[in-house]
Swiss-Prot record:
This is Ion-translocating oxidoreductase complex subunit C. Residues 368-397, 407-436 form the 4Fe-4S ferredoxin-type domain. GO terms for molecular function: 4 iron, 4 sulfur cluster binding; electron transfer activity; metal ion binding. Coiled coil: none annotated. Transmembrane segments: none annotated. Pfam families: Complex1_51K, Fer4_7, RnfC_N, SLBB.
Length: 673
């Protein structure tokens, strides 16, 4: 009995609140096997096909590439993208991508050469011989991302799980109407999917591995059971069909009975989830050595004549796939990427297929029905009953319309999975999911701006702190420089002063050069002394002539010369206090000539007259008296106010002096004759 209850608990499944049962519409496309689509002539590969930043380009325009060649480098959460076929890179430019607003993303545009040549592939058939880190790195570098719709990098997800994961869940529910990509993949490639699941289990080492699949896929269930017949490490759980049981939080609750907390992740409760398409891509990356260059896409809707599931190369234009399926557009044709509840309408058909593209729905006008007018909310609470996340959609609707971001956040709008169940049941035809998407985008923009402001504030505060530190260090340096020198500094200063005094004392002492030292000037000194002795002897031999020469006339001339020098000095002082007078060189020359003539005349007179005895003491006294008078006149000239000089008067005086000099010279010539 105990074993029976244990077995019952082992296969037990739970339920979640809310949910709806829309028409499935899956039989249009799940009855035909997977098929290949002819290569498009041109491929557009967006660099960003996942959650996170785009990778770094490693190709340029004009490069030839092979299928599987990396177009970008993957570092951190930057997932690389690879060439879907061989060809030539003709452009690297923005191009519209798979987005509700058809936003432009930087893309690599390749012209296919039709050869479809692969790069050299190196598979790891014995993946167990490699470490966990090596497997995760290979999965990341081969561009594997979540193919269920989220597009989160698989390698990053496996790395973040670490040792906390106790349950690995493989999501095979595929609950949205029309989509059968996973269903057909499980029917055609069940063995490869199970091998990929085992690689994931080898990396994570969980206690249990669960596959959750809805009961509306009988062929896929039978194929998986056949592959898992001898396997005891993987459990297949068939769950009731209910939308949105394929949501990550909803499927976790169905299979484990655990609820992911608000704002948390499934890894917080020891659960990690991967899609069956992701498991297949992991097998091809690790075992076959093939990067992800294609995926299964459902082509369905009444506007296509050949619905089914195809292997679509990444970067293939949507128009090319629909034309291969027999697309017959109407006047106002609508094409939806994704399902009717969570998908979005494409503005044009040149958008490329990316890693998260799982379905292209081309419905007819009668299939989708006429658009209905949006009406006011009647507070019926039907949306709250259908919400699988236990939210209050009608309150979130009012908060979103009123721009009440704080209240919307407090009511856990971030937990909305945008499944569209509330909009499906709304009797007023309110597009609630559109309001919620817009509100979440605005909240994210506000948070991003707040983050930038906080970072800018932190940078400013760090700069201010750095400036304060530099200022304090500067003041400390100035303060230390102003401190009195220490005792050892005083000793150094005293020694320097002593050296200076010693040098000064040496400079004042007479320099005595010993004979024989360098330079030796003794011979020159002796010659000079000999000349002086000869001059004295000669002077002693002619005392009469010397006394005659040094008679009264020369003494008188010396006195006059002293007086002239005093006058000249006085005039210089007056010139220093008065404005400078123009100097006449001719006048100075005339005056000098007159003085020489007078001196010559006096000498002649002295030669004709008998020489009077000269008293040297008397001559010295007279010269001293003359110098004293000259000095007194200089002092008086310095104390008296300077008279203004008249240049015309000076010129007249100079002319008179020249005339007198000529007359004196003529008179001297007459006297000599």
């Amino acid at each position: 009995m105990l074993k029976l209850f244990s077995a019952f608990r082992k296969d037990k499944i739970w339920d979640f609140d809310g949910g709806i049962h829309p028409p499935e519409m899956k039989t249009q496309s799940n009855g035909t096997p997977l098929r290949q689509v002819p290569l498009a002539p041109r491929f557009v590969i967006p660099l960003k096909q996942h959650i996170g930043a785009e990778g770094e380009l490693c190709v340029s325009v004009g490069d030839r590439v092979l299928r599987g060649q990396a177009l970008t480098r993957g570092r951190g959460r930057m997932l690389p993208v690879h060439a879907p076929t061989s060809g030539t890179v003709i452009a690297i430019a923005p191009h519209s991508t798979a987005h509700p607003s058809a936003l432009a993303e930087l893309s690599v545009i390749i012209d296919a050469d039709g050869e479809d040549r692969w790069i050299e592939r190196e598979g790891w058939s014995d993946y167990r011989a490699h470490s966990r880190e090596a497997l995760i790195e290979r999965i990341h570098q081969y561009g594997v991302a979540g193919l269920g719709g989220a597009g989160f990098p698989t390698g990053v997800k496996l790395q973040g799980g670490g040792d906390k994961i106790t349950t690995l869940i493989i999501n095979a529910a595929e609950c949205e109407p029309y989509i059968t990509a996973d269903d057909r993949l499980m029917q055609d490639c069940a063995a490869q999917i199970v091998e990929g699941i085992r690689i994931l289990a080898h990396i994570l080492q969980p206690r249990e591995v669960l596959i959750g699949i809805e009961d509306n896929k009988p062929q896929a269930i039978s194929m998986l059971r056949a592959v898992l017949a001898d396997a005891h490490d993987i459990s297949l759980r068939v769950i009731p069909t209910k939308y949105p049981s394929g949501g990550a939080k909803q499927l976790t609750q169905i299979l484990t009975g655990k609820q992911v907390p608000h704002g948390g992740r499934s890894s917080d409760i020891g659960v990690l989830m991967q899609n069956v398409g992701t498991a297949y891509a992991v097998k091809r990356a690790v075992v076959d050595g093939e990067p992800i260059t294609e995926r299964v896409v459902t082509l369905t809707g009444e506007a296509v004549s050949r619905p089914g599931n195809v292997w679509a190369r990444l970067g293939t234009p949507v128009r090319h796939l629909l034309n291969d399926a027999g697309f017959c557009p109407s006047a106002d044709q609508m094409v939806i990427m994704g399902g009717p509840l969570m998908g979005f309408t494409l503005p044009w058909l040149d958008v490329p297929v990316v890693k998260i593209t799982n379905c292209l729905l081309a419905p007819s006008v009668t299939e989708m029905g006429a658009p209905q007018e949006e009406k006011s909310c009647i507070r019926c609470s039907a949306c709250a009953d259908a919400c699988p996340a236990d939210l209050l959609p009608q309150q979130l609707y009012w908060f979103s319309k009123g721009q009440q971001h704080d209240k919307a956040t407090a009511h856990h709008i971030a937990d909305c999975i945008e499944c569209g169940a509330c909009a499906w049941v709304c009797p007023s035809n309110i597009p609630l999911v559109q309001y919620f998407r817009q509100e979440k985008a605005e909240i994210n923009a506000i948070r991003l701006e707040e983050k930038r402001a906080a970072e800018a504030k932190a940078r400013f505060e760090a700069r201010q702190a750095r400036l304060e530190r530099e200022k304090a260090a500067r003041l400390a340096r100035h303060k230390s420089a102003a401190v009195q020198p220490a005792a050892k500094d005083q000793d150094a200063i005293a020694a320097a002063l002593a050296r200076v005094k010693e040098k000064q004392a040496q400079a004042t002492q007479p320099v005595v050069i010993q004979a024989g030292s360098l330079p030796d000037n003794s011979a020159v000194i002796e010659a000079r002394e000999a000349r002086k002795a000869q001059a004295r002897a000669k002077q002693a031999a002619h005392p009469v002539a010397d006394s005659a020469i040094s008679g009264g006339a020369p003494r008188k001339a010396a006195v006059e010369a002293a007086i002239a020098r005093a006058k000249a000095r006085k005039q210089e002082q007056q010139a220093g206090s008065e404005p400078a007078e123009p100097v006449d060189p001719r006048k100075a020359a005339v005056e000098a000539a007159i003085a020489r003539a007078k001196a010559r005349k006096q000498e002649q007179q002295a030669g004709s007259e008998p020489a009077e005895p000269v008293d040297p003491r008397k001559a010295a006294v007279e010269a001293a008296i003359a110098r004293a008078k000259a000095r007194k006149q200089e002092q008086q000239a310095g104390s008296e106010p300077a008279e203004p000089a008249d240049p015309r008067k000076a010129a007249v005086a100079a002319a008179i002096a020249r005339v007198q000099a000529k007359k004196a010279a003529q008179q001297q010539v007459v006297n000599e004759d």
